Regions:
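Mature catalytic domains of secreted/periplasmic carbohydrate-active enzymes
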Residues: 22-393
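Bacterial Sec-dependent N-terminal signal peptides
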Residues: 1-23
C-alpha cells in the first residue's frame, strides 16, 4: 500500500558515486558513543537495504511540537540568528525588549524559557484525538540548545530554563497514547548558522562593539552563566565562512560547500554523540534532520554512522520488529532508497512511488506574534486541503 504523509508542525513540527572506501575530510570519532553494529553499515550501499516499515506506509498524518526557547520572544523562526542581524525586525525587537546583543544575546534568553504550563500528556492525547498517527518532538534546533538531559551539551533544558527533560516528557506521553515517537535534530548547522553572533553594529552608538558570540567561559565570572562556556552554545571559535556578512549566504553553504568554514572533528563528533545519546535514551521510531542528505555529508561520515546506528539500534530494541523511519531532504534517487524523502512546505508535482513526507507548520516554525495578531496562521480548511494534496500523491 502506497502512503504519502503529512507532518504538521505546531509552533507551540553529494552523491559522489563512491560507495566504499571513501575518505572524509572530517571523520567522526566514536571515542564516547559507539555505533551500534548490525545489519546496516555506514555506507550508502548498505543503507539502501532499508525497507520502509508497514506502519509508516499506512500512516497519513503526524503532528510535530516544534517548540523551544526561540519561541520566547515571539519573533518567529531563526530568531536566535536574526537578533544578530543589525536592523532586522528581530534585532529591533530584541534591542527594545531585552537589550543590545553585545550585552544580552540568545544565551540570556534561555533562562526565560520556563515551560511552566507544559502538559505533554494533555497535548499528545489531544493530537491523537484529532487524528495524529505519529508524533514528533524537537530535540534541538540550529540554536544548539538540547531539550533533554544531555550529557554532551551543558546548555540543555535540565540545566538552564525549564529544569525539565522535555524529550523525556514527550516520549512518555507518546508511549502512553500509543503513538510512534519522533525526534528532530537541527544543531549540526549551528557552526555556520550562528556566525552573525561574531559581528558588531556598523552604525550608531554601539558601532564596533562585538556581539556576545565570541565570549568565553572566563568571561562569565560573576554573571548568571558563570561556569558555562558560551562557545559550547555558539560554537564561534573559528573563522567566518566566505561571504558570511551576506545574510543569505548560509543557504548556498547548507551542504557544506561554497566557501563555508569546515567544522572541526570535535564539533562534528559532539553532534554525533548528542544524537546517538538521544536515540539510545528515548528509542524513537522516527528521526528527522534539516539537511541535504544526512548530517555533515559529504565532508564527514557522521550522518551515515548515525543512520546505521539508528536502524541497528531499532532492530535490537524492537527485537526484530523494525519500526525505524529516518528523513532526509534534497536526496538523490539512490539516497531515497536509504532514507524517507521529506519535502519542506511543499509536495512533488506528480505521484511518487515510494513513501515520502511533507513537513509544514501552521505559521512560522517558531511562534511569531505578528502572524497571530494578523490572523495569518493556517486555518483548518488550509490544513485539510494540504493533507488531501499530499496523501493523493
Amino acid at each position: 500500500m502506497k502512503a504519502k504523509h503529512f507532518l504538521l508542525a505546531s509552533a507551540l513540527l553529494l552523491w559522489t558515486g563512491v560507495l566504499e572506501a571513501q575518505t572524509y575530510q572530517v571523520p567522526v570519532s566514536e571515542k564516547n558513543e559507539k555505533m551500534q553494529e548490525g545489519e546496516f553499515e555506514p555506507t550508502w550501499e548498505s543503507l539502501q537495504n532499508y525497507k520502509v516499515p508497514e506502519w509508516f506506509r499506512n500512516a497519513k498524518f503526524g503532528i510535530w511540537a516544534h517548540w523551544g526557547p526561540q519561541c520566547v520572544e515571539g519573533s518567529g523562526d531563526w530568531m536566535a540568528r536574526s537578533l544578530y542581524l543589525e536592523g532586522s525586525r528581530e534585532y529591533k525587537h530584541h534591542v527594545e525588549h531585552y537589550g543590545h546583543p553585545s550585552e544580552v544575546g540568545f544565551k540570556d534568553i534561555l533562562p526565560l524559557f520556563k515551560a511552566e504550563k507544559w502538559d505533554p500528556d494533555k497535548l499528545v492525547s489531544f493530537y491523537k484525538k484529532i487524528g495524529a498517527q505519529y508524533f514528533f518532538a524537537l530535540g534541538n534546533h540550529h540554536d544548539n540548545y538540547d531539550l533533554w538531559d544531555s550529557q554532551y551539551q551543558e546548555w540543555n533544558s535540565v540545566n538552564i530554563g525549564p529544569k525539565k527533560d522535555i524529550l523525556a516528557g514527550w516520549a512518555e506521553a507518546a508511549k502512553k497514547n500509543g503513538l510512534p515517537f519522533g525526534i528532530s535534530f537541527h544543531a549540526d548547522h549551528a557552526w555556520s548558522w550562528y556566525e552573525p553572533a561574531q559581528r558588531y553594529d556598523r552604525h550608531g552608538e554601539k558601532a564596533g562593539v562585538p556581539y556576545d558570540g565570541c565570549l568565553t567561559k572566563e568571561d562569565g565570572k560573576g554573571k548568571w552563566w558563570e561556569g558555562y562556556d558560551p562557545q559550547k552554545l555558539y560554537a564561534q571559535n573559528h573563522p567566518l565562512s566566505a561571504g558570511s556578512w551576506a545574510d543569505g549566504m548560509i543557504h548556498r553553504q547548507w551542504a557544506w560547500g561554497n566557501g563555508v568554514c569546515i567544522p572541526t572533528q570535535e564539533y562534528v563528533t559532539n553532534f554525533y554523540d548528542r544524537t546517538v545519546d538521544a536515540i539510545n535514551r528515548y528509542n524513537p521510531d522516527l528521526i528527522y534532520f534539516d539537511v541535504t542528505g544526512v548530517p555533515f555529508y559529504p565532508i564527514s561520515d557522521a550522518g551515515l554512522k548515525i543512520a546505521a546506528h539508528f536502524y541497528n539500534h531499532n532492530m535490537v530494541v524492537r527485537k526484530g520488529d523494525f519500526s525505524a523511519v529516518m528523513f532526509g531532504k534534497i536526496l538523490t534517487d539512490e539516497q531515497r532508497k536509504a532514507l524517507v524523502w521529506d519535502v519542506e512546505r511543499g509536495s512533488p508535482n506528480s505521484i511518487y512511488e515510494e513513501p515520502w513526507q511533507t513537513c509544514s507548520c501552521l505559521g512560522g516554525w517558531h511562534y511569531d506574534t505578528r502572524l497571530a495578531e494578523n490572523g495569518w496562521y493556517k486555518s483548518a480548511s488550509d490544513v485539510v486541503k494540504l493533507l488531501v494534496d499530499v496523501v493523493s500523491k
